[in-house]
């Protein structure tokens, strides 16, 4: 009998399902791990206040738009912040056990929580008190008494600034441009954090084993803590960020013109050519060959 083989048929859907399924499974695992920390899709607001009336007032005012967590002093607030990794913290200053300034100082020097915006509340309005708050890393200051609308504006402004930074990460800007924005927008600890993450990825760029478990182990964080920090800083999950770094380097290799597509895919840790083309197209809008063609056409005009 005779067997006919179609030499030009790669059956991409059949051959490459494993790579896509693997990444999809990793993404689901990542999301499941962070859901163990937060049971809601709402951003988390941590209120640290020893006055029950003020605490209840803030919680009730923001419960429609935030998952509100509360703590009665700075020590409990710090513990809650490390557990929940909230999106923003509103804290009184004068509290028993640990005051708001000390809690702020402790959280801002811990890489797990250094990115979290903190608004300090105080009954004092002196310049010295405000200077002390900013010296320990507070992002904003609000004098009591205050209205819920004013607090809402402060919270929204801080979160919008963080979203703007995350949007810049998500955009298709050059890595060098991103680095400049990072340096200008983040505190020293968060700059070092992003630099370390990039270093860990780039050191093993050709490996397909870089995922949230590998990075969280190297950063000495739980998977959920790393996920929430990466999401807050970049707007991307950890594995999405890894893929974006791979694609940015793939673009650089492509523009150098020294390697063919298969070699580039291997150099950035993707051993499946079909999946590599798919990722590249998702990042830049075109598969690699079309991307080069478009660039050449643009340069000739």
Predicted features along the sequence, with ranges:
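Receiver (REC) domain active-site loop signature in two-component systems and cognate sites
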Residues: 95
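Terminal helix-turn-helix DNA-binding modules in bacterial transcription factors
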Residues: 232-271, 294-301
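C-terminal output helix
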Residues: 146-155, 159, 167
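Acidic, metal-coordinating helix/loop segments flanking the phosphotransfer/catalytic sites
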Residues: 70-88
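Basic/polar phosphate-binding segments, predominantly the helix-turn-helix DNA-binding elements
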Residues: 212-241, 265-290
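C-terminal end segment of the histidine kinase catalytic
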Residues: 1-32, 163-169, 298-301
């Amino acid at each position: 009998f005779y067997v006919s083989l179609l030499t030009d048929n790669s059956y991409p859907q059949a051959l490459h399902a494993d790579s896509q399924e693997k990444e999809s499974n990793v993404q689901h695992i990542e999301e499941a791990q962070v859901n163990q920390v937060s049971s809601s899709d709402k951003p988390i607001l941590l209120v640290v206040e020893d006055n029950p009336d003020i605490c209840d007032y803030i919680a009730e005012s923001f419960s429609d738009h935030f998952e509100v967590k509360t703590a009665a002093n700075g020590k409990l607030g710090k513990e809650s912040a490390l557990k929940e990794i909230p999106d923003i913290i509103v804290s009184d200053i004068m509290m028993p056990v640990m005051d708001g300034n000390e809690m702020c100082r402790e959280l801002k020097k811990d890489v797990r929580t250094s990115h979290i915006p903190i608004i300090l509340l105080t009954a004092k309005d002196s310049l010295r008190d405000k200077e002390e708050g900013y010296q320990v890393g507070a992002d904003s200051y609000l004098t009591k008494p205050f209205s819920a609308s004013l607090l809402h504006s402060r919270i929204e402004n801080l979160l919008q600034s963080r979203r703007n930074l995350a949007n810049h990460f998500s955009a298709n800007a050059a890595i060098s441009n991103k680095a400049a924005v990072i340096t200008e927008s983040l505190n020293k600890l968060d700059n070092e954090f992003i630099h370390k993450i990039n270093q860990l990825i780039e050191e093993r760029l050709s490996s397909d084993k870089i995922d949230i478990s590998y990075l969280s182990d190297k950063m000495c964080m739980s998977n959920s803590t790393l996920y929430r920090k990466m999401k807050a800083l970049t707007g991307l999950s950890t594995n999405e960020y890894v893929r974006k770094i791979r694609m940015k380097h793939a673009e650089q290799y492509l523009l150098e013109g020294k390697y063919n597509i298969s070699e580039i895919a291997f150099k950035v840790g993707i051993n499946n050519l079909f999946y590599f083309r798919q990722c590249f197209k998702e990042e830049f809008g075109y598969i690699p060959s079309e991307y080069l063609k478009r660039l050449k056409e643009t340069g000739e005009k």
